[in-house]
Amino acid sequence: MTHQFRTTTPVRSYTGEQKKDYHQYKEQLASDFNHRCGYTDCQDHWFGGQRTFQIDHLQPWSKYPNRKNDYSNLVYCCSYVNRAKSDDDNPNYLDPCDNDYNNHFFRDKDGCIHGKTEQGMFMAKQMCLSLRRYAIMWNLEQLEIRIDRIRQVLKQKPELNPILSELLSKHYDYVKSLRLHQ
């Protein structure tokens, strides 16, 4: 069984004048990327929120200095993939806003990220997208979605409490696992 990589493709919406420092875009990028890493789709709160997330230059500014402050070249991302990509400018890196990542990546039954296409496999390897931490975070999010649904149903059907208890226990186990894999 496989799962879709993400449900929402980020959309860059900034249309104002180019800023002098790309860091000034961080709040807008966080919003445009739905507070998720553009490459792993993990929510930024698992990494400490917007404060600790980074801004990647799809085309590295060390090699393309004219794109350093170009909003269309910026990707909101976690530090792990930003460091893994570094200043690599291989054309196989796919812009998370211009490509449907569901066509290039999938999650296996455990939530681990895998590439489907040549570009997806390249990125998964280069950016270490198969790290267990990303699967754990995805599973936590899936559990939270299910828990929220059950909590709504429980208002009318309290006999479902054992199911909620089981999901909360799994959620707790994943949180413990995430702490171990930091």
Q: Whereabouts are the PLM-identified features?
A:
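Histidine-centered catalytic micro-motifs used for acid/base chemistry in nuclease
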Residues: 54-61
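Short cysteine-rich clusters marking metal-coordination/redox-active sites
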Residues: 37-40, 78
